[in-house]
Swiss-Prot record:
Binding-site positions, L-glutamine: 52-54, 83, 129-130
The keyword Signal is assigned to this record: no
Keywords tagged on the record: Amino-acid biosynthesis, Aromatic amino acid biosynthesis, Glutamine amidotransferase, Lyase, Tryptophan biosynthesis
Induction: Expression decreases as cell grow from early to late log phase and further decreases in stationary phase; there is about 5-fold less mRNA in stationary than early log phase.
Organism encoding this protein: Pseudomonas aeruginosa (strain ATCC 15692 / DSM 22644 / CIP 104116 / JCM 14847 / LMG 12228 / 1C / PRS 101 / PAO1)
PROSITE patterns: GATASE_TYPE_1 (PS51273)
Protein name per the record: Anthranilate synthase component 2
Disruption phenotype: Cells lacking this gene fail to grow on low-ammonia medium but grew on high-ammonium medium.
Job description of the protein: Part of a heterotetrameric complex that catalyzes the two-step biosynthesis of anthranilate, an intermediate in the biosynthesis of L-tryptophan. In the first step, the glutamine-binding beta subunit (TrpG) of anthranilate synthase (AS) provides the glutamine amidotransferase activity which generates ammonia as a substrate that, along with chorismate, is used in the second step, catalyzed by the large alpha subunit of AS (TrpE) to produce anthranilate. In the absence of TrpG, TrpE can synthesize anthranilate directly from chorismate and high concentrations of ammonia.
Active-site residues, Swiss-Prot/TrEMBL: 79 (nucleophile), 173 (for gatase activity), 175 (for gatase activity)
Pathway it works in: Amino-acid biosynthesis; L-tryptophan biosynthesis; L-tryptophan from chorismate: step 1/5
PANTHER family: MULTIFUNCTIONAL TRYPTOPHAN BIOSYNTHESIS PROTEIN, MULTIFUNCTIONAL TRYPTOPHAN BIOSYNTHESIS PROTEIN-RELATED
Amino acid sequence: MLLMIDNYDSFTYNLVQYFGELKAEVKVVRNDELSVEQIEALAPERIVLSPGPCTPNEAGVSLAVIERFAGKLPLLGVCLGHQSIGQAFGGEVVRARQVMHGKTSPIHHKDLGVFAGLANPLTVTRYHSLVVKRESLPECLEVTAWTQHADGSLDEIMGVRHKTLNVEGVQFHPESILTEQGHELLANFLRQQGGVRGEGN
């Protein structure tokens, strides 16, 4: 079972629909509905942290879920969930250089993890005013996707993953109709097994 932590966001059920189309069994709980211990008792196979309107500090149980389950099962954070992953491992979440609400951007990626086999660059849809500050990214996380300036230098972080654990975040919305290959990205996450990355993950 895939457990979706709903950070009170209207996009959550679009994500649920996409995962359902990929034949995943999904259970949704609000971020203030269950404790970490109650979530553990549900014995999920994987957890997704949804988008939301706040910062990681107001995202209910999200940070505690990352701390408890990282290394035990696959975790994926989307938008706020991605920022929560960055913060949980020691990164800083700051205001983005440019607020993006319903705008598409081409992003570049390393063809790793959830980005494996996807178009590069990939057109994605962004709804966010916050980002993980790239200068603050902890040693244990690597940038897997980014936007670029005209000169090719890195602009904003669009994806991260833990270097040894099955923990990944994407700043954009794979469940948006305007995002290319959103189903394929989520299908890549569903293929991940266990908490520690091994061959084929």
